Amino acid sequence: MKPSIHSLTHQTMQEWVLEQGEKKFRADQIWEWLYRKRVQSFEEMTNLSKDLIAKLNDQFVVNPLKQGIVQESADGTVKYLFELPDGMLIETVLMRQHYGLSVCVTTQVGCNIGCTFCASGLIKKQRDLNNGEIVAQIMLVQKYFAERGQDERVNHIVVMGIGEPFDNYNNVLNFFRTINDDKGMAIGARHITVSTSGLAHKIRNFADEGVQVNLAVSLHAPNNELRSSIMKINRAFPIEKLFAAIEYYIETTNRRVTFEYIMLNEVNDGVEQALELAELLKNIKKLSYVNLIPYTPVSEHDQYSRSPKERVLAFYDTLKKKGVNCVVRQEHGTDIDAAYGQLRSNTMKRDRQKAVAAVNP
């Protein structure tokens, strides 16, 4: 199976071109065709020699993904189901924000983190995506708009799709290098956010990388007992270890950390939990931000329900009174398979039902 050309960073593209006996500037030409002109085949690269095009075709594919189901919401949110070369399925979501187009990408097929409220973890991790498969998600979103005559450019990226990004650390870092490169997509590092469920050692590594990409942490509970009950990752990286890593990140980078907090009715959404959260953040309050997330129900996790508006507001008000910067996140795509992983999970469920029906008519 040939890799995607998108799996090369600009530096490794230059190295490959030199290995083929070509001049280094050919890498810039290929890069421009891929990321500025967004071609879908090597034959469209008209300023390259036939010999170089043949080498590209022999060693790479342009697009490793096949577009499947597309769901478009009334609010402009678009959810894509993509098929990988090995037949596995992933999801990508485009959201329209007041500041532009934001794409949420997937980094793994399935997830092993085991959050008990999340649709993404319904199917265990099968494998990591390589850099090219992550980049290709953005390229296909751009292609989707180009085919409709919509001259819109993706300018924000959130790495919050299926999987734990820091469990696929090197591929995710190369993804950042590719999309941030000023000769390519030129998406500013501060327009990119990566979210982790709390791999403390990787947070420390990330602090030392010196990149300007934003960090978000999926916290969802203010104490170990509650967090371990809804996120098994907390047993490996309890809050004390996690926050030591977060404090190291802040001290090293002087950058703000966003804390994701999903609102589960009468589970983690009480005023007492808000007070605990404020206490937990008191030493890093100036460089922390809490994102309160309304829960999207998942049929397989029917033990949870959405927090009523009054409980969300009481939680929000409590944090505000304690001086914690926070917001209730705007919802997107509530009229489609909204929770991350639902489109993929529901599609696979329907496929299994069809297979069973075919065997037992």
UniProtKB/Swiss-Prot annotation:
What's the name of the protein? Putative dual-specificity RNA methyltransferase RlmN
Question: Which positions are annotated as binding S-adenosyl-L-methionine?
Answer: 163-164, 195, 218-220, 296
The segment(s) forming the Radical SAM core domain are 97-329
UniProt keyword 4Fe-4S, yes or no: yes
Q: Which domain of life is it from?
A: Bacteria
Which GO MF term does the entry hold, naming one? rRNA binding
Cite the InterPro entries for this sequence: Aldolase_TIM, Methyltransferase_A, RlmN_N, RNA_MTrfase_RlmN, rRNA_lsu_MTrfase_RlmN/Cfr, rSAM
Keywords attached to this Swiss-Prot or TrEMBL record, sorted alphabetically, are: 4Fe-4S, Cytoplasm, Iron, Iron-sulfur, Metal-binding, Methyltransferase, rRNA processing, S-adenosyl-L-methionine, Transferase, tRNA processing
What is the E.C. number?
2.1.1.192
Respond yes or no to whether keyword Iron is given for this record: yes
Q: In which broad location class does this protein mainly occur, judging by the first location in its UniProt entry?
A: cytoplasm
**Gene Ontology biological-process annotations:** rRNA base methylation; tRNA methylation
User: Which residues carry out catalysis?
Assistant: 91
Cross-referenced Pfam families: Radical_SAM (PF04055), RlmN_N (PF21016)
Cofactor(s) needed, names only, are: [4Fe-4S] cluster
Entry note: cofactor: Binds 1 [4Fe-4S] cluster. The cluster is coordinated with 3 cysteines and an exchangeable S-adenosyl-L-methionine.
Which protein family is it in? Belongs to the radical SAM superfamily. RlmN family.
